[in-house]
Amino acid sequence: MLTQIKQDAQTRMTKSIDALRHSLTTVRTGRASPALLDGIKVKAYGTDTPLNQVASISVSEGRSLVISLFDKGMIKDVEKAIYASDLGLTPTVVGTVIRLNLPPLTEERRKELSKSVHGEGEDSKVAIRNIRRDANQQVKDLLKDKAVTEDEARGAEDDIQKLTDKAIKDVDEVVKAKEQELMTV
C-alpha cells in the first residue's frame, strides 16, 4: 500500500514537471518554434480551434515562422488571432501563406518573460508540494487505521520528502535553463 502511494506521488510529480516543460515551450526566446503558436485559437467554423489544427506551421530561416492554411478563406481570422495574442508578432500575408518574423527580444521583454517563467516554476513547486501533502495524508490515514506501523509510516514520509526534493530540484533546473535561454542574446 505504501509503495503504491509513493509510486502515485512520483508519477504525479513527474507529470507536473512535464507540464511545466510543455508550458515553457510556448515562451518566446528569440528562436522561431511552432510551439510558440500553441496557445493561439482561431475562430473557425463557429468554434475556437487551435491554430495547429487549421494550418501547418513551419520554421523558415531560423527567425521566422510560415503558416500554411488548410482553408485559404481563413487568412483574415488567423491574422486577427495572431494580433489578439500577447506574443507581440505582426503577421505578413504573402499570397496564401502567413509569415511571422520574430524580432530580437528587447532586454525589458526578456526580463518580463523571465519573471513569467519563474512564476510558472513557482506554480509547479506548489503543485508538487500539494502532491506531497496528499501522499503524506494517505500515509497518516493508513497509520490511523493501524494498516501500517509508525516506523513504516515515518519511512514512507521520508521517501515522499526525498521525491519532493528531487522534483523541486528538477523544476529549478528547468526554470534556470529556460531563463538562461531567454537571457542569451
UniProtKB/Swiss-Prot annotation:
Q: Name one GO cellular component term.
A: cytosol
Query: Which one of the record's GO molecular function terms can you name?
Result: ribosomal large subunit binding
Query: Sorted alphabetically, which keywords does the UniProt record give?
Result: Cytoplasm, Protein biosynthesis
Family matches, as Pfam families: RRF
Q: Where in the cell is it found?
A: Cytoplasm
Q: Name one GO biological process term.
A: cytoplasmic translational termination
In which domain of life is the source organism classified? Bacteria
Query: Which ranges of the sequence are coiled-coil?
Result: none
* HAMAP family, A to Z: RRF
What is this protein's function? Responsible for the release of ribosomes from messenger RNA at the termination of protein biosynthesis. May increase the efficiency of translation by recycling ribosomes from one round of translation to another.
Kindly give the NCBIfam families that the UniProt entry links to this protein.
frr (TIGR00496)
| Protein family per UniProt | Belongs to the RRF family.
Q: What is this protein called?
A: Ribosome-recycling factor
> What organism does this protein naturally occur in?
Xanthomonas oryzae pv. oryzae (strain KACC10331 / KXO85)
Q: Which gene encodes it?
A: frr
